Swiss-Prot record:
It is an enzyme of class 6 (ligase). Catalyzes the attachment of alanine to tRNA(Ala) in a two-step reaction: alanine is first activated by ATP to form Ala-AMP and then transferred to the acceptor end of tRNA(Ala). Also edits incorrectly charged Ser-tRNA(Ala) and Gly-tRNA(Ala) via its editing domain. GO terms for cellular component: cytoplasm. The gene is alaS. This is Alanine--tRNA ligase. The keyword Chloroplast does not apply. The lineage of its organism: Archaea, Methanobacteriati, Methanobacteriota, Stenosarchaea group, Halobacteria.
């Protein structure tokens, strides 16, 4: 930290008469205007002093505070921009949820690859931080959903400006702190009470100096100066133990928590009363949570000390709460009983808002990604509601928040919540027995349920780990969920074919120019000429680099083109095409020779079918959104020559009527013969005009992105497409199926592949008609009739088997042997395993032990049945008999079965059954 001391000595601090001090409680360094101040202003050094003592001239609602902030910075030459969705994976592939305003501009803008939408700019960005979920309700200040008000400036060092998408310095540390001070002053704050705590920032391979801005005990702003990158020989060592060096771009990254500013302006006991006043009162009334005047006073006093509580920073919540109780001179159990119902209500209110943001941005619950996080919040909310006894339907409560946030898809939101509530109840009922069995097993061993079991429960049964924790705790078992749990699950399903060879070639590839992609200039072209720039020898052949190519490399769910490269001497087959760092690698078994001139020829039929299926995928996605709703998002896609699949987010199974409607809408688009247009707009202009639905198939790099427009559907896409929708011919949906909970799959075929698929189905229909000796149109009713008759015959057979078993039992009990006064029937029965079981049950009903054997398809089979209170274990008997025929078996004490391959020893084994029974009864 001392290495950065010079970074914090600002000219602004010197001009304004600030003093640098070290807090005796927290040991941090901070800056203050007050020469007599000793502590840094952050709990536990200082308590909340704004509660019942608002910190600003006026009290503000969320909307009022948001407008005050944005207007202030607009008047100081900042452009106001619209907030991004809370689902950051709409424009980024490295994170799921938006956790800060800077997420909107990472990595492309912060790295200088693309310019920002404005510079400088201000924004109020909705965010969700899942890591705060355990703190919500308990600390009085944490909210999982929040808005980060911010102003940003993007700068480059003068000597490197030509290399980046923005140039020069807009403003840096002094101006950032001056603007922060000015906003506090604008709000009527006492500037002498503000402290700027030195707190270096590190994250994602970058770092820089930063200030936490405290006012009356509350952290109201963070000012980060992102200016360094990780470097082994760097000048600065940061708090993560790594060294860093200055980088060419440097970014002002500020964050002013909207909710906390509104809280300090109102002086309420917790942030929740400031953010959710109506919701809190509604929930308290519904749950019948009331307080006396003295209890309200105690709650307010505890709130002023709640800054001590932070689940991430304290070892034990109970001990921290005991410290608060001791400070208030009250019994800890009294304080806990008073606060816990309120904490649940606070958490429920916060979770409603979080869910409204998630559903409003059309995240669909599932078992992966943002869908899993949404489901986790929803189910945690459901459990809190059940525990505290709130009667109001969950869908209505979420809808109230969605209405306040201005979302228009409220009918879909309510439908999703109702569906999820039903699934939650079913999952709890279905999975509880399996978890209870595991919990008992590991509780007896005094061990935690291991990670492998958690993964299996999740993978095979869909039981979330937090649900396992809840059920297991009731059985005295513990669960430790690893931070990388979902990575471990993903590893089970990831077949990583990437070889080290490509990594080793990276330096060599870096010296090659990017391959000119001719297929973007002419998507119908199938022949071209090129020069061989380099050749990489592989174990299975060669990777050929050309200066330009018509071959499309595998990517975006579209397989690579195939074809040939022809030199003056030979023709070489191209069997695969890959892209790495802008260079396209053509895989072949022959070496054409570096520097050779070649002619390329695509497999025309393969390219045509792939183009048809790629354009058809866009059309299917558009049709699905029209039919199922705007919440539908692409969750994956794969195009082929014979068929394609489109995975989409949806909270219910796609039924046959919906599938037919999607197919009809898609084919109507084909019949309209709409132009399929390719454009290269500026990224920010495209995002502003079309939103982040652009990125259904992934997030492309670069300032200009390639878009494909089909009617009113537009998507960023790098694949090859037909010229007009009519070129597809037709689309036929083959199947719909669930991929996982919350993700549905549509498998379809387009063009000639669709005709092939229909003909294959027709062949199957005609074959079935021939077997049934009817015409094709009568196959369904005939099959239904045959199936009904087959079921009836099965019932008749079962009935006859039961009657036969009863008759056999009556006949054989006369031949029963007596073993110490117990009747036992030991006999060979001609019949299958089902007949053995039925006969054994009938004998047991006659109060006799049944030991039956049969030769079933060349193998010996045994069934043993034992009446109650006989003292013989059927499983042990079967085990001994089965070993005599080279096999095994077992079961519960009253009924067991088994067998082995040595049918010739069946009678010998049955001859020994009497002695086996006698020895067991004697013991």
């Amino acid at each position: 930290m001392s290495e950065l001391e010079s970074e914090y000595r600002l000219e602004y601090f010197e001009t304004e008469g600030f003093h640098r001090k070290q807090c005796p409680v927290t040991d941090v360094y901070f800056w203050t205007r007050d020469p007599d101040r000793e502590t840094c202003g952050e709990p536990p050094a200082d308590d909340y002093s704004f509660i019942d003592n608002p910190g600003f001239d006026d009290q503000y609602s969320l909307s009022g505070m948001r407008e005050e902030f944005l207007s202030f910075f607009e008047s100081r030459d900042h452009d106001r921009i619209e907030p991004y969705p809370v689902a950051a994976n709409r424009w980024r592939d490295d994170v799921l949820l938006t956790q800060a305003s800077i997420y909107d501009f990472q990595p492309l803008v912060t790295s200088g690859q693309t310019p920002p939408p404005a510079n400088p700019l201000c924004i109020s960005q909705p965010c969700i931080r899942m890591q705060d979920i355990d703190n919500v309700g308990k600390t009085g200040r944490h909210t999982m959903a929040f808005e980060m008000m911010a102003h940003h400036a993007f700068n480059t060092r003068e000597d490197a400006s030509d290399e980046y998408a923005y140039t020069g310095e807009v403003y840096w540390k002094d101006e950032t702190v001056r603007l922060c001070d000015a906003f506090f002053e604008h709000m009527g704050a006492d500037l002498t009470e503000i402290t700027y705590i030195e707190d270096p920032w590190v994250g994602g391979g970058n770092a820089g100096p930063a200030f936490e801005v405290l006012y009356r005990g509350a952290e109201l702003a963070t000012l980060v100066f992102m200016s360094m990158e990780q470097d082994e020989s760097g000048e600065y060592e940061m708090k993560d133990g790594n060294r860093y060096s200055p980088m060419d771009t440097y970014v002002v990254d500020t964050g002013y928590g909207l909710e906390r500013w509104a809280w300090v302006s109102q002086g309420t006991p917790t942030v929740y009363e400031a953010v959710y006043p109506d919701t809190i009162e509604f929930l308290k009334n519904d749950a019948d949570v009331t307080h006396t005047t003295d209890e309200k006073e105690l709650i307010q006093q505890a709130a002023m000390l709640s800054g001590y509580l932070d689940i991430d920073e304290i070892d034990n919540l109970a001990s921290a709460r005991a410290d608060v109780a001791d400070e208030l001179d009250v019994d800890p159990s009294v304080l806990t009983d008073l606060l816990e119902p309120l904490e649940s209500i606070y958490a429920i209110a916060d979770h409603y808002r979080t869910l409204a943001y998630m559903f409003g941005d059309e995240i669909v619950p599932s078992n992966v990604g943002t869908g899993y996080l949404t489901r986790m919040v929803l189910r945690r909310t459901q459990r809190l509601i059940d525990d505290i006894g709130i009667d109001a339907p969950l869908d209505e409560l979420v809808d109230m928040q969605a209405e306040r946030l201005g979302y228009e898809n409220r009918d879909t939101i309510r439908d999703i919540v109702r569906t999820e509530d039903r699934k939650y109840r079913e999952t709890l009922s279905r999975g509880r027995r399996r978890v209870e069995t595991l919990a008992d097993e590991y509780a007896d061993r005094n061990e935690s349920i291991p990670v492998d079991e958690l993964i299996e429960l999740y993978d095979s049964h869909g039981i979330q780990p937090d649900m396992v924790t809840e059920i297991a705790s009731d059985r005295g078992a513990t669960v430790e969920i690893p931070d990388d749990f979902y990575s471990l699950v993903a590893d089970r399903h990831t077949d990583d074919d990437t070889t080290e060879t490509i990594e080793k070639r990276r330096d060599r590839l870096a010296d090659l120019p990017e391959t000119d992609r001719l297929y973007y200039d002419d998507q119908t072209g199938t022949e071209f000429e090129a020069v061989v720039l380099d050749i990489f020898e592989q174990d299975t052949g060669y990777d050929i680099v050309l200066d330009q190519t018509m071959f499309y490399p595998e990517g975006g769910g579209q397989p690579a083109d195939h074809g040939t490269l022809t030199t003056e001497e030979e023709t070489i087959e191209i069997t695969d095409v890959k892209a790495q760092d802008g260079v396209i690698l053509h895989q072949a078994t022959e070496n054409p020779g570096k520097g050779d001139f070649i002619r390329g020829q695509l497999d025309v039929e393969r390219r045509r079918r792939l183009m048809q299926h790629h354009t058809a995928t866009h059309i299917i996605g558009h049709a699905a959104r029209k039919v199922l709703g705007d919440h539908v998002r692409q969750a994956g896609a794969q195009k082929g020559t014979d068929s394609a699949r489109f995975d989409l987010t949806h909270y219910e199974r796609i039924n046959r009527i919906e599938a037919k409607t999607i197919e009809s809408v898609a084919n109507d688009i084909i019949r309209q013969n709409i132009s399929v247009r390719q454009d290269w707009p500026d990224r920010h202009e495209a995002e502003n005009e079309h939103g982040f639905d652009l990125y259904q198939g992934g997030i492309p790099p670069g300032q200009n992105i390639r878009t494909i427009t089909i009617g009113d559907d537009i998507q960023a896409c790098g694949g090859t497409h037909v010229t007009r929708t009519g070129d597809i011919g037709t689309i036929k949906i083959l199947t719909t199926e669930p991929v996982q909970d919350g993700v549905e799959r549509i498998v379809f075929a387009a063009g000639d592949a669709a005709i092939d698929a229909v003909q294959t189905t027709e062949d199957a229909l005609y074959d079935a008609a021939d077997v049934l000796d009817v015409t094709p149109e009568h196959v369904p009713e005939t099959a239904d009739r045959f199936f009904t008759e087959w079921k009836e015959r099965g019932k008749t057979i079962d009935k006859l088997k039961s009657e036969l078993a009863e008759a056999r039992a009556q006949g054989v009990t006369a031949d029963a042997v007596s073993i110490d006064g117990i009747d036992a029937v030991i006999k060979t029965v001609n019949g299958d395993a089902d007949e053995l079981r039925k006969t054994a049950n009938a004998i047991v009903d006659e109060d006799a032990v049944a030991v039956l054997g049969s030769d079933v398809d060349g193998s010996a089979q045994f069934v043993v049945g034992v009446p109650e209170d006989i003292g013989i274990n059927a499983g042990d008997v079967v085990g001994q008999l089965a070993r005599k025929v080279g096999g095994g078996g077992g079961g519960p004490p009253d009924f067991a079965q088994g067998g082995g391959p040595d049918a010739a020893s069946l009678e010998v084994a049955l001859d020994d059954a009497t002695s086996v029974l006698r020895s067991m009864h004697e013991t």
